[in-house]
């Protein structure tokens, strides 16, 4: 018989369910992911550090877990919420059940919760602080402690998942890329190696002299958790890299950090984008890509003198029709740097990609490597390779 568990939110609401995984309690920002598959990649994605993830699909664990579909060296989410778990997987690749995987990494999770109601609450009120507990089953007590817990805003969480030393992969590659590692997904590393790169992962706290010693042909600014505005040292480093005119590419958090480095602003989204079927328009070609997303912050186009393109609260059907008409937008940062918006979300108009007109640098907010998700955007890595070859 499963032990009783309690999920409490900072707005005072609470949900009882059954314990899934380890016993104990965990605190974090409550967010939702709409993927029907890919739960193992979600669990192991370092960008979810500090977050309790609600899976909107009702059955989780059908195909178990395996030794290949991992994005880091272990589970990184703070907690997990599902409607119903499956403890007898049906897949030839499975090496362990989903509940046993949670227990292996001591992850506190809950099942039997109305995840549809929970998702609607997050959509209406926004992502909020929450906690799962098997030891404190008093709703008033747990809600009080949730309210007292730290917010994700202003927190540097990258230090929890960044490496402590340089890690070299594919040393015989045709060209070299430093990955400024704030919690890089292994799928990104796989795609860099796929296009022939020697990969050098470095701590997110290095300085320009550390980068110069490695003499890379390019630098990729990785994904990662937390508030980008809190990573002041990394932002300064990116400014220095731009002065050196080293080819730069950014993914997710890396996109936000590049935007901040040129004088832009970031903002916290109401509930964010987390799923594997988000439509994004490439404004340069008019092509629509189906992409994987995991971000709760975004770059503000208004900080480049451009209009707001939409919001999470607008009617998606009406907004999408209007956004389809937009072509490439060019703005100027407060530092006088020309910024071209290259990609936008067709769901809500969020800025999903940019290019610096006078510097060898570009970035995307979505995840081109997917893992999980469609491969529409994998050309990002070939594009980065071409940029490096042009500059080199």
UniProtKB/Swiss-Prot annotation:
**Part of which pathway?**
Amino-acid biosynthesis; L-arginine biosynthesis; carbamoyl phosphate from bicarbonate: step 1/1; Pyrimidine metabolism; UMP biosynthesis via de novo pathway; (S)-dihydroorotate from bicarbonate: step 1/3
Query: What positions does UniProt annotate as the active site of this protein?
Result: 252 (nucleophile), 367, 369
Reactions listed under catalytic activity: hydrogencarbonate + L-glutamine + 2 ATP + H2O = carbamoyl phosphate + L-glutamate + 2 ADP + phosphate + 2 H(+)
User: Which Pfam families does the record associate with it?
Assistant: CPSase_sm_chain (PF00988), GATase (PF00117)
List keywords of the entry alphabetically.
Amino-acid biosynthesis, Arginine biosynthesis, ATP-binding, Glutamine amidotransferase, Ligase, Nucleotide-binding, Pyrimidine biosynthesis
Q: Which CDD domains match?
A: GATase1_CPSase
EC number(s)?
6.3.5.5
- List this protein's GO terms for biological process: 'de novo' pyrimidine nucleobase biosynthetic process; 'de novo' UMP biosynthetic process; glutamine metabolic process; L-arginine biosynthetic process
The Glutamine amidotransferase type-1 domain sits at 176-392
Residues of the region (CPSase) are 1-174
- Family stated for the protein in its record: Belongs to the CarA family.
What is said about its interaction partners and assembly? Composed of two chains; the small (or glutamine) chain promotes the hydrolysis of glutamine to ammonia, which is used by the large (or ammonia) chain to synthesize carbamoyl phosphate. Tetramer of heterodimers (alpha,beta)4.
Name used for this protein in its record: Carbamoyl phosphate synthase small chain
Species classification = Bacteria, Thermotogati, Thermotogota, Thermotogae, Thermotogales
